[in-house]
Amino acid sequence: MADKVNVCIVGSGNWGSAIAKIVGANAAALPEFEERVTMFVYEELIDGKKLTEIINETHENVKYLKGHKLPPNVVAVPDLVEAAKNADILIFVVPHQFIPNFCKQLLGKIKPNAIAISLIKGFDKAEGGGIDLISHIITRHLKIPCAVLMGANLANEVAEGNFCETTIGCTDKKYGKVLRDLFQANHFRVVVVDDADAVEVCGALKNIVACGAGFVDGLKLGDNTKAAVIRLGLMEMIRFVDVFYPGSKLSTFFESCGVADLITTCYGGRNRRVSEAFVTSGKTIEELEKEMLNGQKLQGPPTAEEVNYMLKNKGLEDKFPLFTAIHKICTNQLKPNDLIDCIRNHPEHMDTSIMPSPKLQNL
């Protein structure tokens, strides 16, 4: 890696702008980083003026993080290749569906020894169905290592400077230290683990559970029911990782990327909010996305669809009744008030061996 590490943030939405506050401040303060941080911004017109110009003149992303100043060393760039070409660290923080196209644009245009880190909570569709981890797509396309950062990190609260934790999954200790230095702040505490796939899968699966929590809120079933859905969701997350990503550690689920992110998303995230409105309004998920999310995309329903494809392929739908029911509610195969009947006889209530005991050695 270069003497002075250049950093590029690929994305400038709500979360990308919030993380730019931390990354920009650290790049300016720490001698190992180049002070100037580029941030790729999809060009939009706001009241007739380019968003990149507004950000570079006012140091505020008025569309996605209004009211929060970005460090002046964070420079908005409307051209992806131009923003990324000198980067030693590429921070990917865009909706997951853009990643394959962005990787095509960047192929051969970035430093060959660069590293990436994905802050993207979601999967892409694998060829032939199922899920493809975003970090795997980035590594496969760009031929560079890709770590992940996931945690209980609601963007507006991070931007406010409220205390929280996050988890970096990185298999290379040397890169893990550099990434920790880049993201660590007094209010944003970082734990690095080597269980990268489990960290990333947690970041996507919790969005499915949050939809279930939203259905419970919309049905006004109360806190006990919501707590049960969250707990069963955690058990299905652990079970899913055990089936599809064997060798992961149980301890990872007790980091910020696991149980903490699950809780905060089930109480404060957009998947929960939209799912509650889905019950109370009678509108479709697509209609509510347009009305409520200011151009952002919901991750829970498409993730539930791909997870269901994988479960169906292995004949495991009955072992994951919560994930299965949430998918069927999102696709109108079931009504929201069918949710509780689907989980009343959950395998977790019948079979104490659902969580394989060997993992307990990893606590």
Swiss-Prot record:
Predominant subcellular localization, coarse grouping: cytoplasm
Active site residues per record: 206
Where, by residue number, does substrate bind? 121, 270-271
Q: What InterPro entries does this protein map onto?
A: 6-PGluconate_DH-like_C_sf, 6PGD_dom2, G3P_DH_NAD-dep, G3P_DH_NAD-dep_C, G3P_DH_NAD-dep_euk, G3P_DH_NAD-dep_N, NAD(P)-bd_dom_sf
**Which key words tag this protein in UniProt?**
Cytoplasm, NAD, Oxidoreductase
Name the Enzyme Commission number(s) assigned to this protein. Answer: 1.1.1.8
Recorded consequence of changing residue 14 to Y: In allele GPDH-ACYG22
Listed under catalytic activity are: sn-glycerol 3-phosphate + NAD(+) = dihydroxyacetone phosphate + NADH + H(+)
Q: List residues binding NAD(+).
A: 11-16, 98, 121, 155, 270, 299
- Top-level EC class as recorded in UniProt: oxidoreductase
Localisation: Cytoplasm
Task: Name the family.
Answer: Belongs to the NAD-dependent glycerol-3-phosphate dehydrogenase family.
Entry protein name: Glycerol-3-phosphate dehydrogenase [NAD(+)], cytoplasmic
- Organism of derivation: Drosophila melanogaster
Q: What is the primary gene name for this protein?
A: Gpdh1
